[in-house]
A protein has these predicted regions:
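Loop-rich non-cytosolic ectodomains and luminal regions
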Residues: 2-487
Length: 488
């Protein structure tokens, strides 16, 4: 039975028409071995997915008939199914979980449009019995330097209700720029529009124009923030400065873009220190290189400014920062609730498809972003840098339908699910196996214990030891279950 509209069960499941799709991550991390060796399937554990939509495209009933999903999926809230944001990525995440933990009960809740919607979704799935929650939601207005409402909600669920929360790290990769604000002394649009930031680190030269490239046939988002507290979180006075982002049609910053760029000029004084810019390059088969400037319109110069450039995980649609890039090992682009104190943040590695060993995905967002303010907006005596990303899991894996426009890398007729959105549900499913294993012994595995097992058992990748790109390494469920047995 598929729970479609809230409160309505659909019993007429359609006949099976295709062969079941199974994520390559099942064998790559050895979840299949863990199930067989320890006789586990996630039974008795409830896992909730919070994502864009579940069945806006249709086809969930066929997926159930083919064994892609369990007979009952509880949909607490579906998206409104309008626009391009509803791609049923949530159903793809549920398929991945069902592959690794086929006995687990599954819930779904739409992520909504803003962090307040996510907070509501987190609380609602918790109220309906979720023991594990996984989401792939990104809101570009979420604070970078302060814990927002969703981060605080996650901390409460973990501490007060014992619910483990997993979140995708994001797909920005190395596309982040940060710097102290450097006053160029120039006003490219006139004094009333503000003084431009100087991108050039050479004190004898000035450059107020930075080139970036947005993806082909894609929508790209830039979120600029700076080190001042957000009015919407702790109250208080909010941002003391007003910064704007100006985008130009050309890489030399000669012609201001007006028709295909959205946002960038909010009055931030007394509000939140964030400017969000949308680049609509849909319909253009070519990548587009443009220039941008950052202007201080009013208030004191911030001590630190940072933007993250986010887009698709597909190479042709992925954006890039073309000059004045920060050193790779210093880049941080996992932000918002993916950097919450109590979340388990999941990055991505390539499944390989038999052609190469697993390697970190170029778009997987590294962690390490400092928290500078407390929940009341007071600057901390020392920045808090959390060890996120926690671990990595496979991406470019099979589902039955998501997405038909994505590459079929291994040519098996099954589309590949790409991004850290594909990685995160692997972690949630492994967690379900661990919770089931502990429940057999009459014990409840607390989130802090669960996270510790996943970290200690992970297969180290990249540089030796912990790193912000791959965390503690690749998930290893069989080893985690063995550690659980030894720890008793």
């Amino acid at each position: 039975m598929l729970l479609g509209l809230p409160g309505h069960l659909i019993n007429d499941v359609q006949a099976a028409t295709t062969t079941k799709a199974v994520t390559q991550g099942d064998t790559l991390i050895g979840a299949d071995l863990a199930r067989n060796i320890y006789d586990l399937n996630g039974a008795g554990i409830t896992v909730a997915v919070i994502s864009d939509s579940f069945n806006c495209l249709g086809g969930a009933e066929i997926g159930q008939a083919n064994g892609e999903l369990p007979a009952t999926v509880t949909v607490l809230k579906e998206a409104d199914c309008q626009g391009e944001k509803t791609l049923d990525e949530g159903r793809a995440m549920l398929e991945v979980i069902h592959d690794l933990a086929p006995g687990a009960s599954l819930l779904f809740h739409a992520m909504g449009d803003n962090p307040a919607d996510l907070t509501q979704a987190l609380n609602r799935v918790a109220d309906h019995g979720a023991q594990i929650i996984v989401d792939d939601a990104i809101y570009f207005s979420e604070p970078m330097f302060q814990d927002g409402p969703a981060s605080q909600a996650i901390d409460r669920l973990v501490a007060e209700r014992g619910i483990a929360v997993f979140s995708s790290a994001g797909n920005a990769g190395l596309n982040s720029y940060q710097s102290v604000f450097s006053d160029s002394g120039t006003y490219p649009l006139g004094e009333k529009h503000g003084v431009a930031h100087d991108f050039n680190p050479n004190p004898r030269e000035t450059d107020t124009c930075q080139t970036i490239t947005v993806g082909a046939d894609a929508f790209t988002i830039l979120s600029l923030q700076w080190d001042q507290p957000a009015k919407s979180i702790g109250g208080g006075n909010g941002s003391a400065s007003d910064l704007d982002v100006v985008v130009y049609d050309d890489p030399a910053c000669k012609r201001v873009a007006r028709t295909w760029v959205i946002g960038g000029s909010t009055d931030n004084l007394g509000g939140d220190p964030v400017e969000v810019v949308g680049f609509d390059n849909k319909g253009n088969r070519h990548r587009k290189t443009v220039g941008l400037s950052i202007l201080k319109v009013a208030g004191p110069a911030p001590g630190l400014l940072k933007y993250i450039l986010s887009g698709s995980s597909l190479p042709s649609e992925h954006p890039s920062i073309d000059e004045y890039r920060n050193a790779p090992k210093t880049v941080t682009s996992a932000f918002g609730h993916a950097n919450a104190a109590s979340v388990f943040s999941v990055g991505a590695i390539e499944a390989g498809h038999g052609k190469k060993p697993p390697a970190p995905s170029y778009y997987s967002s590294p962690g390490g972003l400092p928290v500078l303010f407390d929940n009341q907006g007071q600057r901390l005596a020392e920045p808090i840098v959390r060890r996120h990303v926690d671990a990595v899991a496979p991406t470019n894996v099979n589902t039955s339908f998501f997405s038909k426009t994505r590459p079929d890398l291994e040519k098996d007729g099954k589309p590949n699910f790409t991004g850290t959105s594909a990685a995160a549900p692997h972690a949630a499913a492994v967690a379900a196996l661990l919770l089931q294993a502990e429940a057999r012994n009459g014990q409840v595995l607390k989130p802090i214990q669960l996270y510790d097992l996943l970290r200690r058992s992970a297969l180290d990748m990249s540089t030796p030891g912990y790193d912000y790109e791959t965390g503690y390494g690749l998930l290893q469920p069989a080893k985690a279950i063995n550690l659980l047995s030894n720890d008793r």
